[in-house]
């Protein structure tokens, strides 16, 4: 009797299987196939595995950086089949691009067998994985922590000023942080980490991390680096966007760069200007360096006599014409996206504007209340 129940159940399952939604079929099948173009290589993805993870696991050199839906480097096109685009930052993939069949390799999962086209030749050839020890923790402000990471003896990491690393969490998720030290200071990897409300990793840094803890990371990543040019440089830093700028400025001094350098550091209040003495010292020691801090919401207690308002407004007051300058902006996605249209109206050229936008993990953002 039990055998008949089993036969009837199996027959019913086989009968309804073709009408199951692709996502359910994929879940039951356990694996889907992904064919990557232009190399026409086919790999198998486990249920719930992103296109990127499946490809990397099977030796496909795919382009990526942040691995959390924030940068857009791994953008690809779905040629055939269905995918779940997953959670990502709107700044990395627009609604129009999604409608055109674009998805992010690091977020999308296959719902059935799919064919994907990506831009070959963009894979990160030098990226490596490291295990480091937390050598020092120093609170620079109530919400900014300096973290110094030490690599095992005899091991180092070669990078360019302006690049960053991905901290690898226990579940494989990544969190991106810029090198704050210059390449000629290889003893420690310096990070400047800002506490994000509801941020899983940053909360861990501020509440649980201890000196001696181990951290896995991968790097170096990114191309937010100084270009070879004779143009004056304008750095625009928002909050901890100062970290990669610090690396780039100190590297420029080390290399004897004589170009004029202007640093506009935009924060809300005086306490957010967490290392003011450092750029002030640079200005005293290097005649070609100029430091302009800008507070958008100074408090009466700040007794602030310096520049106020929005950071791009301060730049345009000083430089009504920016055609001859290179602009390097680093900070939140909102800040970076807001300033460039204004600067370009005053002559800043597309080929001379570079940015590194800090994005909250798309997965973390999805579970946080929308800010009004």
Whereabouts are the PLM-identified features?
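Short, surface-exposed secondary-structure boundary micro-motifs
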Residues: 79-82, 121, 170, 220
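Fe-S ferredoxin-like electron-transfer domains
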Residues: 93, 100-150
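Short, conserved phosphate/pyrophosphate- and ester-handling motifs at nucleotide-, phospho-/glycolipid
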Residues: 162, 241, 332
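Ferredoxin-reductase
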Residues: 126-214, 232, 267-269, 294-298
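Reductase modules of NAD(P)H-dependent flavoproteins
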Residues: 1-108, 260, 267-372
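Short, Lys/Arg- and Gly-enriched loop/turn segments at beta-strand edges
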Residues: 173-180, 222-229, 365
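Residue-level marker of beta-strand positions
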Residues: 50, 57, 113-115, 164, ...
């Amino acid at each position: 009797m039990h055998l008949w129940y089993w036969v009837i159940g199996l027959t019913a399952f086989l009968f309804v299987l073709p009408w199951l939604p692709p996502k359910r079929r994929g879940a039951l099948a356990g694996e889907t196939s992904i064919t990557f173009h232009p190399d026409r290589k086919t790999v198998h993805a486990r249920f719930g595995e992103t296109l990127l993870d499946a490809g990397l696991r099977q030796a496909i050199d795919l382009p990526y950086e942040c691995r959390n839906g924030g940068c857009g480097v791994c953008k690809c096109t779905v040629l055939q089949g269905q995918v779940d685009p997953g959670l990502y930052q709107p700044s990395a993939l627009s609604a129009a691009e999604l409608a055109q069949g674009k998805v992010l390799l690091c977020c999308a999962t296959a719902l059935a067998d799919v064919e994907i086209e990506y831009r070959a030749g963009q894979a990160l050839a030098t990226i490596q994985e490291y295990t480091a020890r937390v050598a020092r923790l120093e609170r620079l402000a109530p919400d900014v922590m300096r973290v110094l990471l030490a690599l095992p003896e005899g091991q180092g990491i070669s990078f360019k000023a302006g690049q960053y690393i991905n901290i690898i969490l226990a579940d494989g998720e990544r969190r991106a942080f810029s090198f704050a030290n210059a390449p000629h200071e290889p003893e420690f990897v310096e990070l400047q980490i800002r506490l994000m409300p509801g941020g899983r990793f940053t909360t861990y840094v501020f509440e649980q991390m201890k000196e001696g803890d181990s951290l896995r990371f991968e790097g170096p990543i990114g191309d937010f680096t100084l270009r070879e040019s004779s143009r004056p440089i304008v750095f625009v830093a928002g909050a901890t966007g100062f970290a990669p700028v610090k690396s780039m400025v100190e590297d420029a001094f080390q290399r004897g760069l004589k170009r004029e350098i202007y640093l506009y550091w935009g924060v809300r209040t005086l306490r957010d200007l967490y290392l003011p003495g450092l750029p002030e010292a640079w200005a005293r020691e290097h005649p070609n360096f100029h430091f302009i801090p800008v507070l958008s919401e100074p408090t009466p207690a700040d007794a602030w006599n310096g520049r106020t308002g929005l950071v791009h407004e301060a730049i345009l007051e000083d430089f009504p014409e920016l055609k001859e300058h290179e602009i390097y902006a680093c900070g939140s996605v909102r800040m970076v996206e807001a300033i460039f249209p204004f600067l370009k109206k005053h002559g800043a050229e597309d080929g001379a504007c570079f940015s590194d936008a800090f994005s909250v993990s798309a997965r973390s953002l999805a579970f946080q209340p929308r800010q009004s």
